[in-house]
């Protein structure tokens, strides 16, 4: 799958209507759904959340959750829809998401993450990927990030969408977490250098695809977020 240009998952933004519009503007873009919790898929009519029938672009379904069995079940449901990839959210820092023990807080529990992903991969008909931050709170973005990525790579995860900031889980709301923690693009570039066999797609603060494509030519793709609708 071509991930050179991706539109990030954004709550209350990347619904199927917005994705349809993005598809009109660019046939090359890889699109993401909003994050959908596994329980929402499992306890309702799946098509209410997963219908993607009018989207021609490659589309990634992003799922949230921390229960391996629930994530496995949601992945099974997703197989009947035309998604190119299933992505586990490991980067959302909101307090509501934290209280449900999913999103960025899971970066503190690599063993649980591995269990979740292993169950998803057992049933997924397409690739399973992750979206991460450089770390959370006082996470060591050199040693701990490398260890985290290495652990997931060892179980078969090959694609990492990396928001080039840490997530601060206390004291900042999601909007502040998109702007206050400093960007560290060099750390993402180093991650690719150290794990050259993995697909590394960079996200965070990117508002010009052409300049980013040049700056990050050694990476496997560019992901834009707010720049997709703030113009």
Go through each PLM region and give its residues.
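Flavin-dependent oxidoreductase catalytic cores
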Residues: 1-231
